[in-house]
Amino acid sequence: MNYYSASISQLIEEFTKLPGIGRKTAQRLAFHVINMPIQDAHNLADAIVKAKENIKYCKVCTNLTDQEVCNICSDERRDPLLICVVEDPRDVVAMERTKEFKGYYHVLHGAISPLEGIGPEDIKIKELLVRLSAQSADEVIIATNPNIEGEATAMYLSKLLKPMGIKVSRIAHGIPVGGDLEYADEVTLTKALEGRREI
């Protein structure tokens, strides 16, 4: 039996569709939204809709942006011969927090995972190859997560890029195996970047 009104039930149901949100958390969020001032609820709804309508892939690196080319790719002070490949837009933010990396990025939006049915064609590898054929690079640093999927992706990329005459390196594993890049602190990421190795 459903104890909530149709509107509350629908709100709870929508929150449960978010990753990591179970029924109890969805209920707490729903009641928080219901109890907030109406203007705050409108602002939240508007922010969600604007993000969905305006966010797109950067034409250069495939990071998420509301412009044709993201702020990082627009920054001419960066080293154009150095590209860091990451799995997720949040990894770009994590790397930028170190203030150590001065090149550009390429965001794959995932990692190769045969068990989940994710192959190379399902992530932004083709876009990376097109980019590298049009723009020269001395080194590509692969900063995928240190788990099975990240390692598989790194090895696959290495096999594709080495014949192009590009130095391919992998960030060092100051990051725990099985961990996510976005949760690593700046010092750990800095050390991992400094200790990268060629693959």
Swiss-Prot record:
Q: Domain of life, per the record?
A: Bacteria
What SUPFAM superfamilies has UniProt attached to this entry?
Recombination protein RecR (SSF111304)
Q: Name one GO molecular function term.
A: DNA binding
What cystine linkages occur within this chain? none
Q: Which residues form the Toprim domain?
A: 81-176
* Residues in C4-type zinc fingers: 58-73
Set out the biological process GO terms recorded for this chain's protein: DNA recombination; DNA repair
Q: Which Pfam families match?
A: RecR_C, RecR_HhH, RecR_ZnF, Toprim_4
Q: What does this protein do?
A: May play a role in DNA repair. It seems to be involved in an RecBC-independent recombinational process of DNA repair. It may act with RecF and RecO.
Similarity field: Belongs to the RecR family.
The name of this protein is Recombination protein RecR
Q: Which organism is it from?
A: Alkaliphilus oremlandii (strain OhILAs)
Question: What's the encoding gene here?
Answer: recR
